[in-house]
């Protein structure tokens, strides 16, 4: 099992997912690992990081999504230590496009923050 948590947040409308993503990266030392359109006007963002950092970031993202005019927070989940099978199948891994941000969040690199 992974030592890093996964957080997933889904909204109805683009502005609340954008606000949530921004709030999450500002609130916790996390990395956004994927963003997707989940259906008609529904969007999801997935984050990774230490359990406590993901919880802090998700709290900020939930509040930001709830407070965005015209948008709706649909659902969210935090999985503290996802099983490796989940990581192998779902788009929640650290791809090369987010490596600099992961290193910065973990304090081991000089990525942008």
UniProtKB/Swiss-Prot annotation:
It comes from the Bacteria. The keyword Transferase does not apply. Residues 5-91 form the BMC domain. Induction: Carboxysome size and components vary with growth conditions. When grown in ambient air at medium light (50 uE meter(-2) second(-1)) there are 52 units of this protein per carboxysome, the numbers are stable under low light and high light, and increase under high CO(2) (at protein level). The CcmK3:CcmK4 ratio of 1:3.8 is stable over all growth conditions. One of its GO terms (molecular function) is structural constituent of carboxysome shell. The keyword Amino-acid biosynthesis does not apply. InterPro entries: Bact_microcomp_CS, BMC_dom, BMC_shell, CcmK, CcmK-like_sf, CcmK/CsoS1_BMC. One of the shell proteins of the carboxysome, a polyhedral inclusion where RuBisCO (ribulose bisphosphate carboxylase, rbcL-rbcS) is sequestered. Assembles into hexamers which make sheets that form the facets of the polyhedral carboxysome. The hexamer central pore probably regulates metabolite flux. A minor shell protein of the carboxysome, a polyhedral inclusion where RuBisCO (ribulose bisphosphate carboxylase, rbcL-rbcS) is sequestered. Hexamers form sheets that form the facets of the polyhedral carboxysome. The shell is 4.5 nm thick, as observed for CcmK proteins. In PCC 7942 there are several CcmK paralogs with presumably functional differences; replacing the central pore residues (34-37) with those of CcmK2 from this organism (Tyr-Glu-Lys-Ile) allows the bacterium to make carboxysomes, but the expression level is too low to know if the carboxysome is functional for CO(2) fixation. The tight homohexamer forms a pore with an opening of about 5 Angstroms in diameter and is positively charged. This is Carboxysome shell protein CcmK4. The gene is ccmK4.
């Amino acid at each position: 099992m992974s030592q890093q948590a996964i957080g997933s947040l889904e909204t109805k409308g683009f502005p609340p997912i954008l606000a949530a993503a921004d709030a999450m990266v500002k609130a916790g030392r996390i990395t956004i690992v994927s963003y997707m359109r989940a259906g008609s006007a529904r969007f999801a963002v997935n984050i990774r990081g230490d359990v406590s950092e993901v919880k802090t970031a998700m709290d900020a993202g939930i509040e930001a999504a709830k407070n965005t005019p015209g948008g709706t927070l649909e659902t969210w989940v935090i999985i503290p230590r996802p099983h490796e099978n989940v990581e192998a199948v779902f788009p929640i891994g650290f791809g090369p496009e987010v490596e600099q941000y992961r290193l910065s969040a973990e304090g081991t690199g000089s990525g942008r923050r």
